[in-house]
Amino acid sequence: MNKGSKKMQRWYFRSFDTTIIRVWSSWLVNTTSEPWEYAPANLTKLKLEEPDPNLMELLPRIDVLVISGGHWFAKKTAYLLGGKLVGGQLWSHKNLGKGIPETEAFGIAMETSLSSIATDPLYKGLTILRTYSPDHYDGGTWNTGGSCTEKTRPSRPWEVAHNPHTELMRSLQ
């Protein structure tokens, strides 16, 4: 039985007395849509030093947590650190300068999330980190018409495309 929404789905398996919950946390850190300095109003702002409060609220009730993420950092976002705008992805502003890149923001967010989980005194569960997934689309990327729907088995090691960006993102986990 599936009860939920895009943000959270819940399946209960009566014969095993087991519940599986899928919690959607795009960036694993707190986000805001509030206006912030000169960042565009419609832009998602990531508070890199604050874990996702929805995930942290559920954490004490979770026995096994599987974390999978990273690809959302390629979306248009602003990065906040210490209450200041420190970078962004797919937008710029003369006052921002170069700012921190997507990869550094991802590393900070991973550290924030994993540290918060590891030090939560009420969480007694097991955490499994699924590393940043390699490129797996045929005929283009996810946003240029590529598809992964024809995949019928896991890729063999020699079939995986080696991409420096993917390898960097994995190393930051």
Label the model's feature ranges:
Residues 1-173:
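A compositional signature for long Ser/Thr(±Pro)-rich, low-complexity
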